[in-house]
A protein has these predicted regions:
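Glycine- and charge-enriched loop/helix tracts that form the active or gating conduit
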Residues: 1-146
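Histidine/acidic-rich helix-loop-helix segments that form or flank divalent-metal centers
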Residues: 109-120, 149-202
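Short, flexible beta-strand-to-coil junctions
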Residues: 135-138, 199-203
């Protein structure tokens, strides 16, 4: 109501708003970032309690393709808007504060390098959503559930193999000349975007 606007508070319409449609949490983070609003105490309690309770039929060990749209394609659409038009760092800070990262993957809840990594992706012209997801244990599965474009899914899938290769005995010495590294990367057939995401992961 008018008083909530005056208090710069975001309020859900009813007590089951989040369980009915979890995309409302992402939308709330967008409005909070853009307008400088905060969740009301009741709304915050609803978000944290609902995500902790996980009332939805789909669970993490289920096939990504079986997730309902509100935990999949519609969630991605809200995230696409978040990264395209909102102060994304503020919006993601809100989601972290609300303990809502588990809507994507619980590992994202404690991601201290998030803003630095996504800022690097922005500078390199990479899509920001997969740059956020790269630290998940299986980022390609999260991307598949969200319906991220297939080429971006391939980058994330290849990133897991690139990580393994970098830990193997077959990689050049860390102090090798750039042309040695370039030749090694090209020989392995890594896509340029995959290598760029790996660069974003470096401290």
């Amino acid at each position: 109501g008018q008083q909530d606007l005056a208090d710069r508070c975001l309020v859900f319409l009813h007590r089951e708003s989040v369980s009915d449609d979890p995309t409302r949490v992402i939308r709330a983070s967008r409005y909070a970032a853009r307008l400088g609003f905060v969740l009301s105490p009741e709304a915050l309690q609803q978000v944290t309690a609902t995500v902790r309770r996980w009332p939805w039929a789909w669970h993490w060990n289920d096939a990504p393709e079986q997730a309902p749209p509100a935990l999949a394609s519609r969630l991605r659409m809200e995230l696409d808007r978040l990264f395209a038009v909102e102060p994304w760092a503020v919006a993601l800070d809100c989601l972290e504060e609300w303990q809502a990262m588990a809507l994507l993957d619980s590992s994202l809840q404690h991601d201290r390098d998030r803003n630095r990594r996504i800022a690097w992706a922005q500078r390199l012209g990479l899509p920001l959503l997969p740059a956020w997801l790269v630290v998940a244990p299986n980022p390609e599965a999260v991307a598949r559930r969200l319906g991220v474009p297939g080429q971006q899914q391939q980058w994330l899938k290849q990133l897991l193999r690139l990580r393994e290769w970098l830990l193997s005995v077959d990689v050049p010495d860390v102090h090798a000349a750039p042309d040695v590294w370039t030749a090694a990367l090209e020989t392995q057939g890594w896509m340029p975007e995959t290598v760029a995401f790996m660069v974003c992961l470096q401290p």
